[in-house]
Amino acid sequence: KIDSVSFPDSLKKIKRHAFEDCEYLKDIDFGNGIEVIGLHKSRIYDSSVFNGCSSLKHVTFPKQIKEIGRMAFKDSGLEKVELNEGLKLIGEAAFAYCKIKALRIPASVYDVDYMAFAGVDYVVFENESMTTSAAFALITEQIGTVHVTAGNKSIYIMSPTMKECLDGSVRTMDDMKRFAEEKAITMAEFLIKKDDSNGFKKMLEINDYCYDTLKSILDNIQIDNAVCMAYLMDEIEKKREAEDEFSM
């Protein structure tokens, strides 16, 4: 039973399937030599270096790590991940379907692959130019929501709709915010059916919808949840007052 592993400074790369399904593994010390964890761009082979390590809860990547390969930590027990400044590439499904609530992507990262963060609740991209990669990385077939921040802009959106951002029309966070406006009714319906008043409030606050979008939600959805209705009416009133003030 392997419950911890330490890598010597002389080792530069961890190869495919090295610790796949090591269910007792809890601690990893990458040392000062490891730069590459598995394969990044291969469409033929997955890396699965720590795939399925269900007891692994927390990983801190040291400063020399440059690449995290395809499916490297997929389906592991990870709850907290600290990515290093200097990291450049994150492969397909690298952290997909873990238990990570929030993840910060350093500005040094310039390439993030398909479904890399599928299932993560909140992702912060320090590099705002990573918007297209953000959509690509957050695609998932699981029905859920995701909060994305890039630079000083944020959106809150349904994860499966991210694939619709890949037609070339979404290149900036402003484009993504417009996309969030277009999907407002779909997302509002989803949250109301779940009876998720906190999620509904979060959607309204983060996406900061315009008056017309808020009115469209009111006119097109049956809202039986009194709390959600109160949140919506409050936002509509705020936008109405702001528009009245602007027109004076």
Q: What do the predicted segments below correspond to?
A:
Residues S197-L204, A226-D234:
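Ankyrin repeat structural motif
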Residues K238:
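Alpha-helical DNA-recognition elements
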Residues F246-M248:
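Non-Sec secretion/translocation targeting segments of pathogen effectors
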Residues L191, N220-I221:
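Ankyrin-repeat helical register
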Residues K1-K13, E23-R43, N51-E67, S76-L89, ...:
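Structural signature of tandem-repeat unit edges
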Residues E241-A242:
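Terminal, non-catalytic domain-edge segments
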